[in-house]
Amino acid sequence: MTHEEFEKAAGYWKKKDAAGKKMDRGTLTAAMETYIQAHNTCALATGAGTFVRCTPIEYSWHDGAFWIFSEGGLKFFALERNKNVCLAIYDPYEGFGKLNGMQVTGTVEIVEPFCNEYLKAATFKKIPLEALMKLPSPIHLIKMTPKHIDFLSSAFQKQGFDCRQSMEF
């Protein structure tokens, strides 16, 4: 592909979104919350320089953030260097009329083990504090705060909206 072809492909959704029928923020927020709550696993993409990693991992959603407990792994190599991440939540592909998926970009912070925020997330996740305290090293808690969400759902078209909806936070 030429540079111009790459630019055209990269701008596809921006051009299409400009002409699309948008949901009001309240309706879109409710749809996003419902979709996020209906799932518990995402693909978390991290990167720094030439290093990239995409990790399938469980999450919980509350207080306007994604909360991810993790023992460790190479994602932390990137997270130390770059707090910008992207996560994807999606349904299995069953055809164009049944598309459902979400891409969330945002920033992360590593929550200090056993601080109030950590304990609240563990309680929400129903992880016993006693079990966490017995581990030889603490489980890390990643808090991902969304900055932008792109949500694709075929159901939106049935409601008279464009199938792709976006929201800035």
Q: What feature does the model see in each segment?
A:
Residues 25-29, 72, 125-127:
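Charged, amphipathic alpha-helical segments
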Residues 65-66, 84, 107, 148:
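Structural motif
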Residues 1-23, 99-169:
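Charged, gly/pro-rich active-site loop segments
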Residues 39-72, 87-91, 100:
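Short beta-strand segments
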Residues 48, 90-95, 131-137:
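A short, aromatic/hydrophobic, helix- or strand-capping loop or linear motif
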Residues 72-75, 147:
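A generic "binding-loop/recognition-motif" signal
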